[in-house]
Amino acid sequence: MKKFKILLSLVMLIGLILAGCGKEESATSADGKTTIDFAIHVANPKEQEPAFYKVIEKFQEENPDIKVNLIGKEQQEHVKGIKMQSQSDKLPDVFWMLPASAAELEKAGMLMDLTGFLDDNPDIKSALKPNMINSFNKDGRQYGLPYQPLITGLFYNKALFDKYGVKIPETFEDLAEAAKVFEKNGITTISKGAKDDYSVWAFLTMLSRYGYFDKIDNILAGKESYNNADFVNYYKKIDELRKVGAFPKNVTTQTYFQAVEQFLAGKAAMLDSGMWDVQKIEQSPIGKDVGFWWGPTFTDGVGDQKVSSVVSSAPLLVSKKAGEDKAKKEAILKLLKFYYGEKGTQIMVDNQVAPMTNATVNVDEAAHPLFKKLVDQVQLKGWNSQQNQPDLVVPEAIGSAMYDSIYGVINGTYTPVQAAKIVDEKISAIK
């Protein structure tokens, strides 16, 4: 019995020592460094997210007392892992997460409130675009901050517009007239691929010009119908473009990636895409001739027509546990200040990621002419971004129905009324 008590005492002592060591390692290690475990949604951050990686690299260089331990996994594995870790309350200190899952973690009380960080850094708070902040704020609690901007719109080949004497459009009427000219000359106006039904970015922004964000909350609550006059008018405009031959004749069988190649080959005047294709376009034979446009305004639209699309694709989150560790919290706040400050922003820009803030940045126009044009559009006076992408604020099934409705009209499968009805029925089905 005596031996058992001694053994039990030794086990408890070892346990206390190990617990103490673990606690010390979680904050400041023996070498005086504080470690931040940062989980990211790619397996190789250095290669797959070079802009992000270089910000972290520079931060560590300027803060030798802080080590950022990057934990990289491909997105699906990363998201699954975060969900599993949340069940045992072992979340990483800082991590990337999908918006819907981030909201669930906030609801479960597992995230640090970042409101104080913004209040203590008014320069960053005022520089960040409002929709970047508001997307991850619930009842006054700032539970996340944007990882990087998601910028979408229409790339256009100015050489084709010049060749056929067509001006760069501003209004829907301009776009429809341009489509007629291009159709006569065997040129596709807007290259698209219905096989990848999510590839409707610019058309989702157009939907925002018909009052989408004024209506969607009431629509989801059952107080209004998606099948309303304004949204039907929106689909009518897509149908008009179809009738004047604006889309590829093989749009139903073409993929998004084939649509990109069609544009790069000079066979289409425009491409519905986003910032991720800038480098590929710049390196192509048409690169020097390409510009970027937010899409047309509509005379029958609802509300502000100068709507751009600079939104946050996903947030960075800080675990509540990390916020309760004084050393970690201090290190994390330093990292966030660097990431969203002028230095971090410029490093992002140097690596072809457009700014999330209104900070003045320097772009090497000679090396990256299209990226410079995109940044100019992001910072264009008088244009304000939609709150988010319309498909990102509804359940996935409804988002998919929206894709189907848009391509259904482009393909000639649905009438405008049928398109609106398809989405409305999906909303009713999942209530």
Task: Enumerate the language-model features and the residues they cover.
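Conserved N-terminal structural module of periplasmic/extracytoplasmic solute-binding proteins
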Residues: 21-108, 119-122, 168, 302-304, ...
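Hinge/lid segment of periplasmic solute-binding proteins
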Residues: 74, 99-152, 176, 182, ...
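A structural signal for short loop-to-beta-strand junctions that line the ligand-binding cleft
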Residues: 93, 124-159, 188-194, 302-309, ...
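Extracytoplasmic/periplasmic solute-binding protein
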Residues: 139, 143-147, 152, 176-224, ...
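Glycine-centered hinge/linker elements that transmit conformational signals in sensory
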Residues: 181-182, 221-251
